[in-house]
Each structure stands twice: as C-alpha cells, then as structure tokens.
Amino acid sequence: MTEFLPFVARHIGPRHEDERAMLAALGLPSMETLITQAVPASIRLNRALNLPAALSEADALAELGTIMGRNVVKKSFIGAGYHGVHTPPVIQRNLFENPAWYTAYTPYQSEISQGRLELLFHFQTLVAELTGLPVACASLLDEATAVAEAIGVACRHHRDKRSRILLAGELHPQTVDVVNTRAEPLGWEIATGSDVDDNTAAIVVPWPDTRGVYGDFAKVIADAKAKGALVIAVADPLALTIMEAPARWGADMAVGSMQRYGVPMGFGGPHAAYLAVSEALTRIIPGRIVGQSVDAHGRAAYRLALQTREQHIRRDKATSNICTAQALLANMAAAFAIWHGPAGLQAIATRVAALAARFAAALKAAGVEIAGESLFDTVTAKVPGKAAAIAAEADKGGRLIRIIDADTVGVTFDETSTEEDLTALASLFGAKPVGGDTVLVPGKERGEGFLTQEVFHSHRSETEMMRFLRRLADKDLALDRAMIPLGSCTMKLNAAAEMMPVSWNTVANLHPFAPAEQVQGYAKMTSDLEAWLCEITGFAGVSLQPNAGSQGEYAGLMAIRHYHQARGQGHRNICLIPSSAHGTNPASASMAGMSVVVVNCRPDGDIDIDDLKAKAEKHRDNLAAFMITYPSTYGVFEEGIKAFCEIVHDNGGQVYFDGANLNALVGLARPADIGADVCHMNLHKTFCIPHGGGGPGVGPIGVAKHLVPYLPGHVEAGSEHAVAAAQFGSASILVITWMYIRMMGGAGLKKATEAAILNANYIAHRLKGVYPILYTGAHDRVAHECIVDTRVLKDSAGITVEDVAKRLIDYGFHAPTMSWPVAGTLMIEPTESEPKLEIDRLCDAMIAIAGEAKKVADGVWPADDNPLANAPHTASDTLATEWKHPYTREEAVFPGGAFDPTAKYWPPVSRVDNVGGDRNLICSCPPVAAYG
C-alpha cells in the first residue's frame, strides 16, 4: 500500500537529500548545528510547541468542515453594510480561486504585474464613474476605516489647522466606532448634527444612512462649502448606478464598500472599500493608486503611481500607514462590473430598489410607520415593543432581519432577494405586497451615461470573460509560475487545501452580525486560532480583528496607549524606532498619537544599544513604546534583543514587537519570552494567507496579560476601540491559517522555520563569492533572509539595482525586495516552500547577471546598450525585424543557456517610465465621449 507524504513534506520545498546537500555546502553536520549558530541561545524555546498533532489534508478538511458545519446559514436581510451576493461562477473559478491571481504580490514591479494592474485600473475607473470624482485609489480595507482615512485627508487638506468633524447623519455603528478610535489620539473632535463652524474640517454625509434613509443635506452641504469644509459622502456603490453621482451634489470625497459587487459577506471580510477624491486632493489620498504610463518603446503600461505619499517612503510623515489593502477583492469587484456592464448593474439595482419600495408600500398600507420617504434597499419600521418578536419569527422562516432597538427593525434587500422573501417578510407585519416597479431613490436619477469604456461592454459571454481573465493572468508572474524571493514578504506556499474552505457556504455566506447561536462554527474556529497563536508567541491574549499588518501595528500601539492612560500616565507619547524599521512603524506610531524618536543602528546593522539606552533614559518620563523588528530588518538575529527590552522596561516603556519576520521564529523562540509586550503577526506572511496581489492581509496582535483589557473591542460586542468594521476583521480567510497550523502541528511549524533559515543561509553562501552579503550575525549566519549588495556592479560597470531587478525578469523571476532596507541592494527571502532546484536557479541567475555586468565593465557591451540596461525584453521586441543590439536575441531572452525555454515567462511590456507616469497622472480610463 502506498504511504502518502504528510502535509509537512508537501509544504516544505527541500527534500531530505536536498537538506543534507545544503548543510554540507555550509560545512555543517546537522540542522541543529545551523540553528545553534544562527539563533541566540538566550532566546531559544527549549520545549515543543503545545499544539494539536498534525492532520492530513483530508482529515483537516473534514475536521474544519464539522466545525464550520455548526454555523447556521440563513438568508440575511440585516444590511448595515453587508449584503448577500451572487458571485458569478466565472469570477469565482477564474479569479477568486485561481492561484495566478491570489498568490501574486503587491505590484511594485510593474513589468510583471500588468494584468492585475490593468484590472485595478478598471476598478478605479468604476469608482470614478460611480462617484463622479476623478481620482480613486485601488482599494482600502473596509468601509469604516475608509471613512476614517477620508477624514484624515480632510484634516491634512487643512494642514491640521481644523480638527472638528461633523457626522451629518446616522452612520453605521461600526463606522462610528472606528472613527472614534482613530479620532482620540489625533485630536479630532467628532460632532453630530448640522452646525458647521470655522473649525470644521469636513462633514460626513451617509448616502443612505444606517436606517436606509436618504436625508435632506442640502443646507448643511451649502454651509460646509461656505465655511471651506470638505464634504465626504459615504455612498452605496450599487445605488449609485441609478442615482446621481455624489460629485454632482457637492461631495469632495466619496467612500464606501464594494462588497456587494460579487464579494461574499464572509462573516465580515475581506472586502474592498473604495475612496474617490477631487483632483485637488490627489496627492494626499491614502493607499495605492494605479496610473497609466508608457514603457521604453512607447507602449501603454500600468504602474503604481505617486508612491512618495506612502509609508515606505514618508514614514511618520506619510498620508497613512496603509500598506496591504484589498487588491484581490477590488479585482473581483471590477470583474463583477465588467461581467454585468452598466445595464446589468442598473438592472440589479433597480430590482433591489423596487423590492424595497414595494415592501415599504405594503407596510404603510398595513399602518406600519417607516423611516423616511427616500430609500434604496432598506426599510426601517417602527414596531413598538415588538422588534425581538418579529425578528424571531423571521428567523423561524430562515431569514435574519436587523433589530435596531426594542421598537425598531430594519429589512435590507439585495440581489439574492426574491418575491417569496418579499411576501414572507411583509407577512411578519400583517402586510401584503402589491406589484409595481416604482423606486424611492431621491433626487435626480443618473441621467448621464456611465461606464461607457469598451471594457465594460465587451465580455458578455462566459467564453469572452474566461479568456479575458486568463489573458490578464498570463501577463503576471505569481507563485504559480516561479519563486518570489521578496525579503520581508514571506511569499510561501498557499496550499490548495488551505484555500478550499474559503469558498464553503458555511464560511462565505454569514453576516457578521448574525445571532451568536448561529455562528458557533466561527466561534470555535477563531477560539482555536487565538489559542494556537498564543502558544506560538507566548502571549496571554490575541485579537484577530486587525485586517492588515499595518492595522495590527496600530491596534498594538493603541493598546499600549490605553494601558498608559489607565495608569494615569497618558503623557507617555514617545515611541523609539530604529532607523532600519519598516515605514509602517513610524506611520502607525504617528496615527497612535506618538512622537517618533529614531534610534541609530551600528555599521554592522545591529541597533546601537548605547544610543537606545541614552534616548530611553532621556525620555524616561514620557517613554511610551519601543518598536523593534526581530529578526532585524537586516535579516539577522541580534544578540542583544533581551537587553533592548530590559532597557525600555526600566524606563517605563512597552516593547512593540513587529512580527514581519516571525517566519524565522515559530517553534524556535517566542516574542513574549524575549520580552515583548505586544506583537502583530502577519497571517499573510508566516501563516499562509496569500497576498492576493496587494491584499487581503490579516494582522492579529498578541499581548501580554496586562494589555489584554486593551485589545480592540467592537460595538456589536458591547465594547469599543475597534480598528476594523467587523469584530473578527477578515474572518473568512482565517480558515486558511487554521488549516495551515492544523496540518503542520508544532513539530511541522518548527521544521518550516528551520527550512526557511537553511534556504536563506544556503543562498547567502552561494552568492557571497560574487556579491557581498551585507549583514550577518554570529558565526557569519543570517536569519531567514539576506541582503545582497549589488552596489558592486554599480561601482564596476554602472549597473544599478533596478537593472538587476529587471534583468531577473528575463531569467523568469520576480525580483527580490529592491533598495530596502539599504539603498542599492536586494533583500532575498526564499521561505521554506521553495525546493533546492528553484533556489539554485535563482542563485545561478544572480551569478550569471554578475557575469553580464563584467562584460559591460570590460567594454564587451556598451554601458547604454546591454541586456541589463535594456531589461526586461518582451517577445515583440525580440522578434523585431531589426536587431541592433551588440548581444544576441538568445542572450536577451534565454540568458544563461541552461534555462528551460518551455517555462519561459514573457513580460508584456519593457521597462516602464515611472517619472513620466507621475508627472502625467492618468488613474482612470476616460469615457468614450472624451475621445469625440
């Protein structure tokens, strides 16, 4: 009988014989010897992780299926920002469940990201068309955080000289909660009503409000304009297909959730939010913006634009700490709009609006008082003393409605609602619906044509749509094609067995505010995950709410802030951050109301302990926190980590441990044991949630016992300080991490960490004779990544790090992290999932590139005309009739000679003009009329 390999062996790339060969190359007798050399003995965990034993893929799927089977999936009419959807199967199968889409990284390397960049460009076009505003970003995390981000834009617009924010109508409670969390450390004054004064930075207009009502905001908008305050519309994007665009009635910004564009509720996420702004606000908008530029041969090409706004460049002066957003879900929303086209979207919206209007008419005829006269999809009914009883009766019939208070219920229709639902719901109120197609949306209908661009009219058949999505995917390089050796990004395997449950009905189709007794599967799964993450990190409590690593940072720092305040030490506001830190660290600290003081690093990359001590003592009366990444952002285990923590604690501060590099620690060491008080964990790095081409991500935080009371709360749970719209953030993708841990077990997780460290040290060993390895720890070892100093090529041949990165595309690779944390270098992280064959292929390519640079240095190839300077090479360029370069076509596209031509990746564009793209920003496709 065949003995099947356990999942651990499927997940880890190097075979046993490969491991022996790699260790031999390092001159080591065993893996334990390597770990002893690389990881300081002072931090080592000297016991096995106390986790359930590993299960096979089949058994883990069965166990999770049983757990999630405890969820009771009923049809939701709760609304409140979450809606039932019909995800088109062609999109679910060819995009959402396709590794070509979900395993890709954020598209910093534009030449190998043209497919997802193009679809994100269409997403921005969709948002711009719906809102009437010219500039949209390529998604934010959820509606609640998008509102908070828009408020931040308004305050920056006024150069922080205005701090009052007027909530002009009733927003969803979770949105108000997130806004209040964001407001406190930044000094925003949150007000309600209609009084606009000279200190008002912005008014926030819900369109519609949480009760489904479109209010009359004409006067408050006019007052805002007169006082110079910005107008932020929180608008339903499905309603906007049949209603006047917010820009037409005075909105300077519009935000909302694109969830109902084909993305399941998922018990709260992940979903893409949108943010659109007027042209005047372009350079202070948060998040990614996809812009159109040209490549070296003048072909249209897409790229991430205006990156100087972002945290990785501006740090504590950034417009936001947003890093990961929701690219995969934004692409689903764009595909949904392309699939249905404007007429299809309007048909869905009109049908939903008609159901709601007929329901409202039926209730009125039965003598039931409803809120407002103008509505789109939601009817709020006054039922004195009967709300719970009516909701219970609806529940018996398999439908969930919203209890707003003891006397009020809300019923929200969506594209899944039927005539049968309408009749059944009306009967709960003693009413009977009548026919008709009247809608009750306010103001002018959308008169102007919208989405006239060809892409929204060209893919009506499934054959066309399937091929469209395939063509886009073929333009990109994701993990399904090749290794993505990005340092600090942990692009490991996202196993099929981990991904499958995300599409299950019991995972995808629950409303986040469904009754607790109906979501016991989620309760068990999240409880398991919290306990396992506590064991892995050593912490006393975990919050799964933060829906990105950046939000985890923010949540952790806010926990520290609230802890100090509770002890009467709210004056503590100094955050010490090493100069080597990732840009989100200072950006998050600023958002948490802290002032950043930079701690120097020594020439060998380690934190300067004397500088840390001096600055901690200098600020001891006001020290709030010290943020440290471990292993360091330079890819080494610093021996002094425990001493760093002691210095901070001795001076009254808390230690924030950035978990970006947790993949080098799991099973070997635990942040809490090292001395950390709080740590965020990137589930989209260490724990196998895919990057999705720029999101989703999940960044839960673990905290020590004294910080547990200050973990994020949620209004639906009767607490506050939420950092995301839903209590469990992007809940549906937590099953990916549950599956990973359940199939690996404690021993498997430790083995994965060891393999990641081995792979990185093997790469450093193979390349160190050609490129300097910039930083190493004791015994000349690195952690799970290494910095390769390509500046030697610049010195000898004028070849830049960008030339090397683009040339790697010709070799079939996504470039490593470029110019971070050290300018002019590449940081390589192979992860444990890459086999030795692929690792050797990367090393061979890097060595071959050094050989090509030598030809430039020796004058064989001119400095301005060589394979590196001209990289990457497209098929069309290579097949051109004339070839005037001093190197051959074969050298251009099949470099090194030993690479498999059948596996060749062809970039769709040559090198993209970044400077020109920023100077001439184009971030949405003009309507057809613009070409007239």
Swiss-Prot record:
It comes from the Bacteria. It is an enzyme of class 1 (oxidoreductase). Keywords: Oxidoreductase, Pyridoxal phosphate. Its cofactor is pyridoxal 5'-phosphate. Its EC number is 1.4.4.2. The keyword Oxidoreductase applies. The keyword Cell inner membrane does not apply. It catalyses: N(6)-[(R)-lipoyl]-L-lysyl-[glycine-cleavage complex H protein] + glycine + H(+) = N(6)-[(R)-S(8)-aminomethyldihydrolipoyl]-L-lysyl-[glycine-cleavage complex H protein] + CO2. GO terms for biological process: glycine decarboxylation via glycine cleavage system. The modification N6-(pyridoxal phosphate)lysine is found at residue 685. One of its GO terms (cellular component) is cytosol. Pfam families: GcvP2_C, GDC-P. One of its GO terms (molecular function) is glycine binding. InterPro entries: GcvP, GDC-P_C, GDC-P_N, GDC_P, PyrdxlP-dep_Trfase, PyrdxlP-dep_Trfase_major, PyrdxlP-dep_Trfase_small. CDD domains: GDC-P. The glycine cleavage system catalyzes the degradation of glycine. The P protein binds the alpha-amino group of glycine through its pyridoxal phosphate cofactor; CO(2) is released and the remaining methylamine moiety is then transferred to the lipoamide cofactor of the H protein. Belongs to the GcvP family. The glycine cleavage system is composed of four proteins: P, T, L and H. NCBIfam families: gcvP (TIGR00461), PRK04366.1 (NF003346). This is Glycine dehydrogenase (decarboxylating).
